[in-house]
């Protein structure tokens, strides 16, 4: 497919638009007493927590309470919130500038597995850099609001139905191969 045939661009947020430093996140978790051993032992619990958190299936307070149970005594929800801010990553202004330019030629959508708290922090960061989501994207699709997550087919179907985009003329940018394959 040539770029002349492309009409729509769909971007993931974490790992594509914003840089996420997994090492920093792990170090931040370890600072709260969530060691590699604990992560290994509680891998199912952590995956379930993150799935529920990212998809808005449980209240944030409930997620934080369960996360506290994995941390060393004396850890507060504020400590965990600081660690979660690490997930907001580093947002290069050049990428935001590129999105604005791309919107002049293509429909540009965001499709991301993210929770409300991290999204609000990300929106705030974009504003600090001088941009609004309306300037950057034609529409935003977030897992927590849709109660679906990539790579489930349902999230792509809903986005396609709402936007009328043609998957055959759409490029997907995601840091996970399974998400671009599903799209």
Segments predicted by a language model, with ranges:
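Short beta-strand/turn micro-motifs composed of small residues
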Residues: 112, 174
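Surface-exposed amphipathic alpha-helices with a cationic face
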Residues: 100-104, 160, 180
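Generic structural signal for small/hydrophobic residues in well-ordered secondary structure
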Residues: 12-15, 56, 102, 110, ...
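A structural signal for isolated positions on well-ordered beta-strands in alpha/beta enzyme cores
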Residues: 107-109, 139, 171
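Acidic, divalent-metal-coordinating active-site segment for phosphoryl/phosphodiester hydrolysis
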Residues: 155, 175-183
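Substrate-recognition "cap/lid" segment bordering the active-site pocket of phosphatases
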Residues: 116-169
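N-terminal helical cap/lid subdomain that shapes the substrate entry/recognition surface
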Residues: 4-93, 104, 118-121
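Glycine-rich phosphate-binding loop signature in dinucleotide/nucleotide-binding domains
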Residues: 2-5, 104-105, 162-169
């Amino acid at each position: 497919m040539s770029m002349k045939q492309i009409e729509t661009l769909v971007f993931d947020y974490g790992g594509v638009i914003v840089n996420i430093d997994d090492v920093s996140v792990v170090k931040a978790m370890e600072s709260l007493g969530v060691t590699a051993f604990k992560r290994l032992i509680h891998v199912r619990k952590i995956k379930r927590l993150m799935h529920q958190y990212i998809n808005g299936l449980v209240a944030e307070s409930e997620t934080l309470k369960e996360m506290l149970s994995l941390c060393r005594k004396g850890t507060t929800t504020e400590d965990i919130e600081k660690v979660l801010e690490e997930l907001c990553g580093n947002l290069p202004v050049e990428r935001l500038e590129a999105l604005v330019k791309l919107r002049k030629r293509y429909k540009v959508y965001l499709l991301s597995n993210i929770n409300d708290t991290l999204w609000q922090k990300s929106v705030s960061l974009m504003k600090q850099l001088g941009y609004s989501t309306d300037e950057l994207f034609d529409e935003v699709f977030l897992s927590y609001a849709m109660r679906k997550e990539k790579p489930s087919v349902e999230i792509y179907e809903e986005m396609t139905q709402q936007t009328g985009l043609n998957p055959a003329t759409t490029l997907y940018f995601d840091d996970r191969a399974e998400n671009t394959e599903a799209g």
